[in-house]
Curated annotation (Swiss-Prot):
CDD domains: ARID_ARID3. Residues 181-273 form the ARID domain. This is AT-rich interactive domain-containing protein cfi-1. Present in IL2 and URA neurons, and in AVD and PVC interneurons. Present in muscles from head and pharynx (at protein level). Transcription factor. Regulates neuronal subtype identity. Involved in motor neuron fate determination and maintenance, acting as a transcriptional repressor to counteract gene activation by transcription factor unc-3 in a subset of motor neurons. Probably acts by binding to specific promoter elements. Promotes differentiation of URA sensory neurons and prevents them from expressing male-specific CEM neuronal features. Promotes differentiation of AVD and PVC interneurons and their glutamate receptor expression. SUPFAM superfamilies: ARID-like (SSF46774).
Length: 467
């Protein structure tokens, strides 16, 4: 194959090995390369090559081309392993390489970038592939930019929507369409602007009983009844619930309405109506918390005055069961503990307005307890006097009588031991007798409250007692 340069017709034979290259001057060349010459001539005519250069310049270009072709040939044979590739036509190695993969073409074009003046088709191919890649990248980048711009447009509109200049009716459409009241739109616009101005912008609509809570109607009803503080003090939430057409089965409807009103509408009420302030609201909430029905464990009517008498009657009944003398200190302590627990329970349950009545009842209860204790003390003094009067008879029995008092109660009723010891006011008769043998025995007979107890006591040996 030969490459035609221009006038004067210079041909470079590239069909032989690079070492056997020859330069022919003239208008004739081999027939085997005529087709390639015609193809190259067509390319040169399409690219409109510059005018012919002088002979010296043409020779220099030819030798420059040969040196670059040698470099390309070595690259293809050694590094790219293309020595075995065969083209359909006997093309030069540089054209054979251009028919290979695109990555190889890029490397080859990078090395042969200086051949643009001689083979203009290479630059066209390079620009064509470059132009094929760039629009795809640009299209992808443009698509990403367009999608990012489209995604940013709603956020920008949302930012504008949060501003006071944006129409609230589009964002809170449900509130505006709850009724046909002509003042609704005006009030909602003014309220939403006010909340935005004080730094508490409304971001959502409260829901109650699976429906939108009509804040406009809630505000109107509360103001008609005197404001939030008045509603809390007078407990008028049932009327508010009926006015809002909420179902009566809602649990804690009063608490929910109060919290929603306090969050969304109370600041607006203080600004426009000036019916109360934050301190009044806090006092009303605290008072309502103290009087909350869930915190009451007793009825709201005053305590009956029969409570001290009932306590004294219970004490009298215990006194009768224990013969009027056996009121132990532990029972009195239990009674005091119960009374204190009851008073503490009532004190936590009742409000401040009932504490005075409770204290009066507690004082009456304490007086009744003191009366019971004094009665027990007087009976104890009488018991001591009786025991002193019978001391001679008991003392005559000596050690045996003492041991009899310690062991005259059966084992089944050990708790009555103290009662028997102190029960000297009842009739008691003790008779003893001794047996004939050396061991002394004593027959004891006692009558207590009409019941006679009788038994025989034996003296213990000293050896047995020591063991």
């Amino acid at each position: 194959m030969s490459v035609r340069i221009d006038e004067p017709q210079l041909f470079v034979s590239m069909s032989k090995e690079p070492t056997q290259e020859t330069v022919n001057v003239g208008g004739h060349h081999d027939d085997s390369s005529s087709n390639c010459d015609e193809r190259v001539d067509d390319q040169t005519e399409e690219q409109k090559s510059p005018p012919a250069s002088p002979d010296l310049t043409a020779n220099l270009n030819v030798f420059d081309l040969e040196s670059r072709q040698k470099v390309v040939q070595r690259l293809l044979n050694s590094q790219l392993n293309l020595s075995n590739l065969r083209a359909p036509l006997n093309l030069p190695p540089i054209f054979q390489a251009l028919q290979g993969p695109f990555s190889i073409q890029q490397q080859l074009l990078g090395l042969a970038s200086g051949l643009t003046a001689i083979s203009p088709g290479l630059d066209d191919y390079d620009e064509e592939n470059t132009n094929q890649g760039e629009p795809e990248d640009l299209t992808l980048g443009g698509f990403r930019k367009e999608t990012s711009v489209k995604s940013e447009e709603p956020s920008e509109s949302g930012i504008n929507a949060s501003g006071p200049a944006w129409s609230y009716e589009e964002q809170f459409k449900q509130l505006y369409e709850l009724s046909d009241d002509v003042k609704r739109k005006e009030w909602l616009d003014d309220w939403l602007n006010f909340m935005h101005r004080i730094g508490k912008p409304v971001t959502r609509i409260p829901i109650m009983a699976k429906q939108v809570l009509d804040l406009y109607e809630l505000y109107r009803l509360v103001v008609q009844h005197g404001g939030l503080v008045e509603i809390i003090n007078k407990k008028l939430w049932r009327e508010i619930t009926k006015g809002l057409n909420l179902p009566s089965s809602i649990t804690s409807a009063a608490f929910t309405l109060r919290t929603q009103y306090q969050k969304y509408l109370y600041d607006y009420e203080c600004e426009k109506e000036k019916l109360s302030n934050q301190s009044d609201l806090q006092q009303a909430i605290d008072g309502n918390r103290r009087e909350a029905p869930g915190r009451r464990t007793a009825p709201s009517f005053p305590l009956p005055f029969q409570l001290p008498h009932a306590a004294s009657a219970a004490a009298t009944m215990l006194n009768n069961q224990l013969n009027g003398l056996g009121m132990r200190n532990d029972l009195l302590d239990d009674e005091n503990t119960l009374s204190l627990q009851a008073s503490g329970l009532f004190g936590t349950s009742y409000g401040a307005e009932q504490m005075a009545i409770l204290e009066a009842h507690q004082r009456n209860l304490e007086r009744a307890q003191r009366a019971v204790q004094q009665q027990v003390a007087r009976q104890s003094l009488g018991l001591t006097a009786c025991s002193n009067g019978n001391g001679g008879n008991i003392h005559n029995s000596g050690r045996e009588s003492t041991s009899s008092n310690d062991s005259d109660i059966p084992a089944k009723r050990p708790k009555l031991e103290n009662d028997v010891k102190t029960n000297g006011a009842s009739s008691m008769r003790i008779s003893t007798k001794h047996s004939d043998n050396s061991k002394t025995s004593m027959s004891v007979s006692m009558e207590i409250n009409g019941i006679t107890y009788q038994g025989v006591l034996f003296a213990l040996d000293e050896t047995v007692s020591e063991s």
